[in-house]
Each structure stands twice: as structure tokens, then as C-alpha cells.
Amino acid sequence: MTVTAALLLVALIAPLAAALATLGWPEPAAPGHPARTGARWRRALVLAASAATAACTLALAALVQRGDTTTLSLLQLTPHTWLTLRVDAVGALYAATAAVLWLLALVYAVGYLRGPRLGRVHAALMVCLAAAIGVAYAGNLLTFFVFYELLSVLTYVLVVHDETPAALAAGLKYIVYVLFGGSLVLAGVLLTFALAGDLSFTVDGVFAAGAPANALRVAFACFALGFGVKAALMPLHGWVADAHPAAPAPCSALLSGVLVAAGGFGLVRVCFEVFGVDTLRSLGVMPWLGAAAAVTIVVAALLALQQDDLKRRLAYSTVSQMGYVTLALALLGPVATAGALVHLVHHAFLKGTLFFCAGSFAHATGRRGMASLAGLAARTPVTAAAFTLATLGMIGVPPLSGFVSKWWLGVGMLESSAPATLVLLLLGALLAAGYLLPVVFALYFAKVVTRPLEVAPKPGVAARSFEVEHRASLLAAISVAAALTLVLGVAASAAGFPLALARQAAATFFGGG
């Protein structure tokens, strides 16, 4: 077995093994109870498994840049169909992003998650991490669908973790949406097999030159709508604004940075490795996808402006930002595609930082409304500074990571002879400033209002009063995530960084690598 194959297996198996092990530990009990010790070991185990997966994915990303790739067959389903894993540039990019953000979310969860059901959520987090790795390294369309659906369905556990009426309602809406989207993706898979007899990922696409155009358009529509549900493409975004506030803050960060991004990643795989650039151009379907993306960018940002709940505001921001990714893919240009891929990565860490901070603000005040943020920077200076840094990154201020991805998006728009789309890029940045800068202003300059120091209790959890910046795990996750928004911008062109992998993947899709 090669080193690449071994790293691939460890990245997938480590979180699955941790999930099985965590289910055997009892739930936390009163201080001094043996279950308390078990809970600590469980947290240590999931952190170790997540760290191992992150290390493996980063090593695989480095190997891919050197030209090392591998294909690993896991299970034969039919004489011609295997569950297969494959390491390539675009998969390595998504896998490393998911694994690193997952590790940060688990570190944050150490200081954030309390109460019952921790074993359940830890197990779900580990299986979801393994599913995300499977999505990233899927070697064919069937393997992708299996892991994609596993990730979609098990995320329900994260959404309903608190088991409040709002969380259960959000979970129901979420599962209805993703099952609908998954059924459309399955229809696309079946149509692809019927038309091509092949579910491989191939740069030139799997369809023969004489394939019926209208049937191909139907297949593409199934994929676009199915993945559009996960990618929050309007009007398929309805689950996002309820699921993000309902989920605990570390899970909200993963919803935004990994789960929603999985929809965008699915579009990348289907566009460039199922249909291929030439087929998509001949079908004439991409302008329709671009139009939906344009509406998503603007309307979601306008909806974000209207939200008083900070997590809902951030959720609509995610919808708007994913519109950039879809719009860039619709342009079918190498630079625009590289910009879309790097924006998937940079947005994940920017939005992860913002959701971590939002969770800490809510813990410090017991509320999520804008009024509760007034003057909070005095009590949470590090968290407020991290939120400010990520806000500037989301707007696209240099030299932060958001500027780098939006620069490449802009250059790609010009290269693709679509300068009008630059208006959307600039308008989106202005609207992002409109819905995020007021939060920063409130943190530093708004008049302090009466604010409870005790967190509003959740069912089954005793109310706690604490200063969030006294919890090292919260500060560590927030600080590292915020630092990444700076490092990924300042050192964007360095070897091994996301931009290099994004350009490598785009060059492969368009025949330059």
C-alpha cells in the first residue's frame, strides 16, 4: 500500500472508529461521577480522531501538489460498479478545508457544549466528518452520492441537538429539503447511467457526442436543483435561515463551511467531471444557472440586512456568498473556476470565525439580537476583534483571505468576457458591509443597555453565568480561525495553500494540467 493510500484510509477510518467508541461511554453526570471521566476521554478521543484526519488531509494536499494521486476501490456493488476513493486536487482542497474547520469546531465545542446528549452529537460529528471526507475523495458519481446523502441525513442530529420546539421544527424543515434535493440528485445519477452507462468522474465528461441534448438538459437540471438545495441556491434555500440558528454554534460553523459547501462542491464535480466544459457549452444551460446565482447574491444579502438575530443574519450571508461560487462556475472559465474553489475555502474559515464569535456573544448575553451586542467588546475584546477581522474579510478588504478569493472571482469574470457580473461582485461587497459593519459598530460603540449576565437555560441544562473569554477552548478556536483569515490572504500564493490547489484543479478541468 502506498503512503497516499494509507493516508486516505486513515482520514476516513479514524472518525468512524471514534464514532463507534464514543457511543459506548455514558452521558456526563454530576461532578465526581465516573461518567465525568468517561466524558473527558470521549472529548479527547474525538479531538484526536479529528486531528488525525486533518493531518492526513493536509499531507494528501501536499502530495497532490507534487503530482501524487491514487485510486482505492472499497466495495464492489455490481460487476461494473465500485465504491471508489480517488485523491485529486479539487478533492484534496475540500477535504483539507472540512477537516481543519471540523477540528476547530470540536475545540470550540469543548467549552461550548454542555448537558445531555453529548455522546450522540459527538458520534454524529464523527460520522459526518467521515462522510465529508468521502464526499471529497469520491472516485465516481455513485460513491459521491452515497457519502453525500450520509452527510446530509446525519446533519439532522446536529440541527436538532437542543431538542427545543424551534430546533425540532428547523430539523423537520431541513430533512424535508435535503431529502427532496437528494432525490433529485439520485434522479440525475440514474439518468447519467442510462445515457452514458458510466458513473466515472472524467475531465471530458462521460457522455458520448451523440447523446440526446434534451435528455442531458434534464439530467443537468436534476443535478443543479438537487445540489442547489444544499448550496442554498434561491429559491431552494428555505432550510438555511432556520437550521443555522437552531444548531449549536460549532455546528452552525460546520453547516455553513462544510455542508453548504458540499452542494457547491457537487456542482463542481458534475459540471466538470460528469458533463465536461464542451458539453455544457453546447447545451446552453449555464446562463440559467448564472441567473439563479445572481438573484441569490442580491436577494439573500438584502434579507440579511433585515435580520435582528445575528445567526440568521450570518445564515443569509452564507446563502449570498455561495451565490458567488455558483455564478463563477456558470462562467465556465479557468480563472473564474479557480476563484470559485478558493472562495469555497476562504468563506468556510471566515464564516466559521463569525459563527464561533456569534456563539460566544450569545453565551455571554443569553440573547442573539443586535441590542444585546451593545458595548460587548469591553467584555469580549478578543472575540470582538476576531469578529471584526472576519467581517473585513467577508467584505473583501486586503490583505485578508476574502479579498484574494474575490480578486480571483473578479479577474475570472473579466477573463470570461462577463464584465457585467463585476457589478454583482461589488454590490455583494457593499451589501456585506451593510449587514456586518453594524454588528461591529454595536460591539464597540453602541450604548450599553441592561443585559443579563446569565445564559438563558436550555431544557435539561442548568443556567450558567460565565465570561466566555475565560474558556481557553473558545478563545483558541476563535483565534486560530481568525488568524487563518489573515494567513490565507497574506500568503495566498504560497505553495501548498488553497489558491495553488484551486488553480491546479481548474487547469485540469480546462485542459491545462
Positions of the model-derived regions?
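Short phosphate-coordinating micro-motif centered on Lys-Gly-acidic
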Residues: 149
